[in-house]
Regions:
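General marker for long, soluble alpha-helical cores
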Residues: 1-139
Length: 139
């Protein structure tokens, strides 16, 4: 599975990937068997060590129907990107953000605090709901 992302091209830290790059990366991850998706996200982070969270956030923005799957797999594979991905979820699908953050926390309790904080920062009105959900998901 190594080198899945070699044809994507360079993505500089702090620079958003192009639409074409987002589409290519999404296709690679989405078309992989579910059992390989976490490994692909890790490989993406290895290939683009300073941009992994930003790239995954761009993928969520471009594919809101898959936001939950991408966010949960990211919490499992790349917990250091959980906050950035949760913030993208809160922007793209705010009505599902608490539920998705809860699933992220159940997948990886270490990602719970960062995900919850990002959701609350993006949507302060949801603070109580997020706090209750996180307490239940990752006591």
């Amino acid at each position: 599975m190594a080198n899945e992302f070699t044809q994507i091209g360079n993505i500089e830290a702090g620079t958003a990937p192009t639409t074409e790059q987002v589409d290519q990366i999404y296709e690679i991850i989405a078309n992989a068997p579910e059992s390989e998706q976490a490994d692909l996200i890790k490989e993406l982070a290895d290939q683009y060590p300073d941009s992994g969270g930003e790239i995954l956030s761009a993928i969520i923005e471009a594919n809101p129907d898959d936001a939950a799957d991408i966010a949960i797999t990211t919490a499992e594979a790349l917990p250091e990107a959980a906050a950035e991905v949760a913030a993208a979820v809160a922007e793209v699908v705010p009505e599902a953000a608490t539920e998705i953050a809860t699933q992220m926390a159940q997948t990886n309790p270490e990602a719970a605090q960062a995900a919850a904080q990002a959701i609350v920062e993006a949507n302060p009105e949801a603070a109580a709901e997020v706090a209750i959900a996180m307490a239940e998901a990752a006591p």
